[in-house]
């Protein structure tokens, strides 16, 4: 309801909260001319959980402006960036500068895979019909080095359950005679990645395309300080697939990571048990042309095949999505380039990023429209982490850049 109010205040013709099979959608539109081009703005109002709360310097759901930054969960991902879009539209509408139609669709399930949005798009194709989709849910290299995201990785996600004995056992009475589910789980997942950083699941790389020489030259031209990178995340050394740079590893190559692992006794003090069960949550970032359904099944089959007979392994498939590559030779991308150049004084670099927005490929499939990913986040904005923030000056430059995108798009259209 709050997003509906904000969009109405900004000047849309109509805005409504629409039901879906999950969380509701917020739809709004401003129709300037039925014959004009239409830009659909996508964003999401859901956020990642704020835990652990004790690591926040401010209340995560009480926005604070301090030291030139907005501090709050969602300040960047994606409430802050979606609000940029609304304010840019408000300016254009107020000053009679809008020459094309605008539609907005904000969802509430992006962080869990956008499970309801695909069916919603299928049901409301005519309502959402557009010529291009504009998204601010990504980032730039730095305030001094603007960039436009031209590629996203896909995603597969699983939960693994390893069961040994049918109840917890005394580690003295049974230790050394019974397989420990936690030990087994740790070995199973550790064996997936080799010392060379390669994922050792058969068939995993079958559909992975190597970056072209031209793309690798472009990546090599992107300003990147490895020492600063390590310092910013607090590690002494980096690890990844041999033969690829850090930027290539995160933008052009797939990954396999344990997101959480638990089992046994984790309370204060000691409790000497062999646990009955152990669990892990695992994500794999995929590159374009990898099918997340195929990869999900490959992983299920792999763990079932290599699991020892001393335990029972259950692999549950969670949400997934396809990667996306944005062409850099179509009118909306050129408009975005000029929008950045006008505000930042530099032509933005085209970059692929490691994150995923699964619904982007669905938009193209169902609506036949390509997306332009004009994000303004920074690595230091701590999305998905405590103390998420957005620099106020960058937020304002984001609004100005989006305004200029629309003005330039009218020239192209």
Where are these regions (language model features)?
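Flexible glycine/proline-rich, aromatic-decorated loop/lid segments
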Residues: 147-163, 374-377
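An extended, acidic, His-containing surface patch that forms the Zn2+-binding/catalytic region
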Residues: 34-35, 48, 142-143, 200-277, ...
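Acidic/histidine-rich catalytic neighborhood of metal-dependent amide-processing enzymes
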Residues: 69-70, 76-151, 413
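Active-site metal-coordination/substrate-binding segment of hydrolases
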Residues: 36-103, 397
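A short core secondary-structure module
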Residues: 119, 175-196
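Generic secondary-structure signature for well-ordered alpha-helical cores
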Residues: 8, 94-97, 125-126, 165-167, ...
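N-terminal helical capping/dimerization or prosegment-like subdomains
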Residues: 1-53, 277, 281, 293-295
């Amino acid at each position: 309801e709050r997003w509906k109010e904000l969009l109405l205040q900004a000047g849309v013709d109509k805005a409504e909260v629409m039901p879906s099979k999950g969380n509701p959608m917020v739809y709004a539109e401003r129709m300037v001319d039925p014959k004009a081009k239409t830009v659909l703005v996508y964003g999401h109002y859901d956020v990642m959980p704020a835990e652990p709360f004790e690591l926040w310097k401010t209340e995560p759901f009480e926005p604070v402006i301090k030291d030139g930054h907005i501090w709050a969960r969602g300040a960047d991902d994606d409430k802050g960036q979606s609000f940029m879009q609304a304010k840019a539209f408000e300016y254009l509408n107020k000053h009679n500068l809008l020459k094309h139609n605008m539609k907005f669709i904000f969802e509430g399930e992006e962080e869990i895979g956008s499970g309801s949005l695909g069916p919603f798009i299928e049901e409301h194709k005519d309502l959402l019909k557009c010529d291009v989709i504009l998204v601010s849910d990504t980032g730039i290299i730095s305030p001094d080095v603007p960039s436009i995201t031209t590629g996203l990785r896909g995603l597969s996600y699983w939960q693994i359950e390893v069961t040994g004995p049918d109840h917890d056992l005394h580690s003295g009475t049974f230790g050394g005679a019974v397989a420990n589910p936690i030990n087994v789980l740790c070995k199973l997942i550790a064996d997936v990645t080799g010392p060379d950083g390669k994922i050792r699941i058969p068939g995993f790389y079958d559909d992975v395309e190597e970056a072209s020489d031209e793309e690798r030259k472009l990546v090599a031209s992107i300003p990147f300080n490895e020492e600063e990178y390590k310092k910013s995340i607090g590690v002494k050394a980096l690890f990844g697939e041999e033969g690829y740079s850090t930027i290539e590893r995160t933008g052009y190559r797939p990954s396999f990571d344990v997101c959480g692992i638990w089992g046994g006794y984790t309370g204060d003090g000691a409790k000497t048990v062999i646990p009955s069960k152990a669990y892990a949550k695992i994500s794999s970032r995929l590159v374009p042309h990898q099918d997340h359904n195929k990869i999900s099944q490959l992983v299920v089959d792999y763990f079932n095949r290599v699991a020892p007979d001393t335990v029972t392994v259950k692999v549950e498939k969670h949400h997934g999505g396809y990667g996306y590559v944005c062409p850099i030779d179509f009118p909306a991308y050129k408009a975005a380039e000029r929008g950045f150049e006008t505000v930042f004084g530099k032509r933005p670099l085209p970059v692929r990023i490691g994150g995923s927005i699964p619904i982007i490929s669905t938009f193209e499939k169902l609506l036949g429209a390509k997306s332009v990913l004009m994000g303004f986040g920074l690595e230091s904005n701590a999305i998905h982490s405590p103390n998420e923030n957005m620099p106020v000056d960058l937020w304002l430059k984001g609004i100005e850049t989006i305004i200029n995108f629309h003005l330039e798009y009218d020239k192209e259209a």
